[in-house]
């Protein structure tokens, strides 16, 4: 396949005003996408965004470009990424566009596309769009220009969709939940969803100002929600990231429940109800504790490369339904086409209600093994992972760890780094093993 110039594994992303993330590119991208998408279908595109101040600028630019190509545009305003995927399906739009840089700081932004079925846009279509980007922008004639409208009830539609994933015979009455919206796209959605299901909700990170998204709040910064759960004597906490496709949780003791533990809860619940299809997909970074806990229940476990895109690919290949990353990207293909933090939280709460159990009880049988990650910088073209010294060190550590440990060495995709990850039963031993391999990598660099 031809190498892509603009689209990465998750659309286009970067610092606003530099590189690719400029209003000029957004305008041209809208036009190029419009040219490709207008060849078939409804000629209707939905645009959603998170709460970054630059979102308005990119929304206007994309809107103008799509209209110039003859496509009608439906604006949603600030809405979670999975909401854009859902409403793209329900409106039978030709595509959905999300303006977001997910968990990145406010000064970054990004643009990615969903296909008409709410899944990632096909690679070949992205290549076609890139080919159109190389051409001069030519506006269609005035009577063919696209029209722009706003989906006034987008929020209500998505709230009802989320609530529909919670079993009708249960409520959240009696639960006190802290919900951290990361000052992002879920700020006006998530608290309402859990309140309407009956919970007492304490919302934090729900006051976006365009420049505070993901700033010391949300799924990538868990300190505040842990403190709030303890201070409010809450039953649990739910932390989402800036665009709402990622979730981390907190139990009543203020302990973080990560994506691996959430996957365990969902798999156990599905198996107990006889609806688990196949097994669970994690990644190379998933904790060995998840693997061992699922083994004990005879639930198959497979690892993909790091990235929710690769989790999705392996789920489809195996025809399984549940997968995700320890960072909180959770996929359940019985409940959506993309990662959805709110719905993942709803499914965990449903498991709690069905089993009349606390979050602590649902995770008690899964032992998270100590995991140490050491980054080693290297110079030049030489690959340290091919060194005999590194291979010997890795083999030595793996022999000492046995079946209750794991070693993973991989190159960073963005920096000249070798990532050394070691897991095992004893933290001090794991740390020593990781440093032993890291020293071998350094000497081979």
From Swiss-Prot:
It comes from the Bacteria. Keywords: Isomerase, Magnesium, Metal-binding, Phosphoprotein. Mg(2+) binds at residues 102, 241, 243, 245. Coiled coil: none annotated. HAMAP family: GlmM_B. Catalyzes the conversion of glucosamine-6-phosphate to glucosamine-1-phosphate. This is Phosphoglucosamine mutase. It comes from Shewanella putrefaciens (strain CN-32 / ATCC BAA-453).
């Amino acid at each position: 396949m031809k190498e892509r110039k603009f689209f990465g594994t998750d659309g286009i992303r970067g610092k606003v005003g530099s590189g690719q993330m400029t209003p000029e590119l957004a305008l041209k991208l809208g036009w190029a996408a419009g040219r490709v998408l207008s060849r078939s279908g409804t000629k209707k595109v939905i645009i959603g965004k998170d709460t970054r101040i630059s979102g308005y600028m990119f929304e206007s630019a994309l809107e103008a470009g799509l209209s110039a190509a003859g496509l009608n545009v439906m604006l949603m305003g600030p809405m979670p990424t999975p909401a854009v995927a859902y409403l793209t399906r329900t409106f039978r739009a030709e595509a959905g566009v999300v303006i977001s840089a997910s968990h990145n700081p406010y000064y970054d932004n990004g643009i990615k596309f969903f296909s008409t079925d709410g899944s990632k846009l096909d690679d070949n279509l992205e290549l076609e769009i890139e080919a159109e980007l190389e051409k001069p922008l030519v506006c269609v004639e005035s009577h063919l220009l696209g029209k722009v409208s706003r989906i006034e009830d987008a929020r209500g539609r998505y709230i009802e969709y989320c609530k529909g994933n919670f079993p009708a015979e249960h409520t959240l009455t009696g639960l006190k939940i802290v919900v951290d919206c990361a000052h992002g796209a879920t700020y006006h959605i998530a608290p309402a969803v859990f309140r309407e299901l009956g919970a007492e909700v304490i919302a934090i990170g729900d006051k976006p100002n365009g420049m505070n998204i993901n700033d010391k709040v949300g799924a990538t910064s868990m300190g505040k929600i842990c403190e709030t759960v303890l201070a409010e004597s809450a039953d649990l906490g739910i932390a989402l990231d800036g665009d709402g496709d990622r979730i981390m949780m907190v139990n009543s003791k203020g302990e973080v429940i990560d994506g691996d533990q959430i996957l365990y809860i969902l798999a156990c619940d599905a198996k107990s109800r006889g609806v688990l299809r196949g097994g669970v997909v994690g990644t190379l970074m998933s904790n060995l504790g998840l693997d061992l806990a699922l083994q004990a229940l005879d639930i198959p476990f497979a690892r993909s490369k790091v990235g929710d895109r690769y989790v999705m690919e392996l789920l489809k290949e195996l025809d399984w339904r549940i997968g995700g990353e320890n960072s909180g990207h959770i996929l359940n293909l019985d409940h959506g086409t993309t990662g959805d933090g709110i719905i993942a939280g709803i499914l965990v709460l449903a498991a709690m209600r069905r089993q009349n159990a606390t979050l602590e009880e649902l995770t008690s049988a899964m032992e998270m093994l100590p995991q140490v990650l050491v980054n080693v910088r290297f110079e030049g073209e030489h690959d340290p992972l091919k060194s005999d010294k590194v291979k010997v060190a890795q083999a030595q550590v793996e022999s000492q760890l046995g079946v209750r440990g794991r070693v993973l060495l991989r190159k960073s995709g963005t920096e000249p780094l070798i990532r050394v990850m070691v897991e095992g039963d004893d933290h001090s031993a794991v740390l020593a093993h990781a440093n032993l391999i890291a020293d071998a990598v350094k000497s081979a660099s």
